[in-house]
Amino acid sequence: MTKLGWGRRVVWGAALAAVAMLGACNGDESAERNRLPGFVSGSVRTTAYDGASDDLLTAGLGKTGLAAATAPGFANPSRPTSAELRRLAIWSNYRALVDMSANGGYGRFWGPNVDLDGNDTLGEGKIPGTEYLAYADDGSGSKNVTLLVQVPASFNPAQPCIVTATSSGSRGVYGAISAAGEWALKRGCAVAYNDKGGGNGAHELGSDTVTLIDGTLANAVLAGTASLFTANVTSGDLAAFNSRFPNRYAFKHAHSQQNPEQDWGRVTLQSVEFAYWALNEQFGPVIDGARHGVRYRAGDITTIAASVSNGGGASLAAAEQDNRGWITAVVVGEPQINVRMAPNAVVRAGGQPVPSFGRPLADYATLANLLEPCAAASASLAGAPYLSALPATTTQSIRTQRCATLAAAGLVAGADTQSQAADALAQLHAAGYLADSDLLQAPMWDSQAIPAIAVTYANAYTRSRVTDNLCNFSFATTNPATGVVAAPAASPMPSVFGVGNGVPPTAGINLVFNDGAGTDHRLATPDASFAGALCLRQLWTNGMLGMPANVDAVRVNANLHGKPAIIVQGRSDALVPVNHASRAYVAQNGISEAGRSQLVFYEVTNGQHFDAFLSVPGFDTRFVPVHYYNVQALNLMWRHLKNGAPLPPSQVIRTVPRGGTPGAAPALTSANLPPISTAPGANAIATGVGTIDVPL
């Protein structure tokens, strides 16, 4: 690793003219100077990686190191270096979005060693190149969106390309490295990353400790505007809060009071503009004897907006907002997107209207958080994958008690647990969840994915402060045995940048319900903090605390302005239901763009949201990797842009589960993964003006 220095903006005056005169013989003095975009705050950190000891894709770990179950460590666990944190972040984030098991496909269908044609030819897969790191801000010092550009040594300045890799979830800046960054680097493209203004920013309130752009720690006061995130709380309020609620944490997505999701499209465009600046710095003509000029202007570089989940939604939003030609095309997987639906839009499956579609996340996530623990008790869901560290008896008790409380509140019908659970599941179906995702209702709640999302997004959509303890929830360290809030044996802050995902529970920081001292929300009451879950639901249903306006601010119009685009999503997705995301987006796109649309949609049967879960018993036998099709979609788009090959039409891809014994499914083969067809026949998805009809 070689530090090339810190780029900086300089106020040029009379000295510029003098330098220009002196340097005229060394370059083109008439060329336009490459100027750092005005939204870049402070300095740009530039680092070169040799592709051996360290690299862009694997942080020096290679294919083998990424697959290691043991995380890379720190020489000093209490004060890791920025290089150690970067290595841990790449290891953690790469593994978070793909199946890392050999039987599941790692090292055979994807991985640093697998080339763009799917062959094992790249060895350890280390990629040399240069990184540019900076904040984007509005001048307040409170936005501080992390931007990162990776330029591989294989980049061809005569055939330039950029791929965005906006972070998935609320992850840090490397949050889409395996989902989009890897493909781009292998293609020789620059990668434009950003953390969407969430970025896993954590503030340990008791010690007033925050993270900086590289994950190293600082006192919040001393860090000032260099902090990735500092809670907006006065010193007096902070002291009072710490006294009453010790061992608590603020997180940027939940507690920035900025509703960052409304800016995801804009910051993705900024990441592309920053990538243009970086490429001009590397490959632009030299002027003034030293400075670089502009070689590439908006629209000159083939640019694919790509990512998954929240990053996929951000990519779609960016393409909609692009009015300068920054983005050429879009390829996204399982996008979390909130669509502003026209009243005449219709989603059909097998010719019949689906019961509900186009709901925003604030609606379906709070409903799922309320009902899923009860629905999971249904006998029809017996054998669902178990994704919890709690004893099975504890989990079953939670499910029974949640059903009983829901029934007492009149929210489900039935005189016994089974009838109540059946009603809860029926309500989820009526709300647009597919029966294909039934067996995932339990693991989505048991893993705490849904509770975490419900709490974080409710805070964001109401612009709540950490001291508000919205719906009596907060984030805290807990006693591992009892779940009661307690001081940690060692602060989680040194590693939060490396292993955190930005949405507690994460990195040893848990989601707690404030019953007295506070307890893990699953254990705080027999019904798993039902009162808090109901409160979150009522924020949406009763339109409280500004939630409707803030949700409206994140909606998109599904107008991609004629850009070619591919959406891929698994039919069994129980985190971001396909009826509310991809299907709804395609239907609305038919109104917003009509005949101009170049959008195609591939729906993958037996595909769900978290490929990282595919090695879990019961996931391995039932579900296939959606990531595989995301990569195929990127290849299809590349051939379309470079060779004019037509994109295969919208279709259902009928995959074949691996089967076998849970936890010991046979190895994934190409027989499980049929190709995307140029002539899908009966599997074709019909689209029209405001309509989509997906074959059953």
Swiss-Prot record:
GO terms for cellular component: extracellular space. InterPro entries: OHBut_olig_hydro_put (IPR016582). Pfam families: 3HBOH (PF10605). Its EC number is 3.1.1.22. It is found in: Secreted. Residues 1-26 form the signal peptide. Pathway: Lipid metabolism; butanoate metabolism. Participates in the degradation of poly-3-hydroxybutyrate (PHB). It works downstream of poly(3-hydroxybutyrate) depolymerase, hydrolyzing D(-)-3-hydroxybutyrate oligomers of various length (3HB-oligomers) into 3HB-monomers. Belongs to the D-(-)-3-hydroxybutyrate oligomer hydrolase family. This is D-(-)-3-hydroxybutyrate oligomer hydrolase.
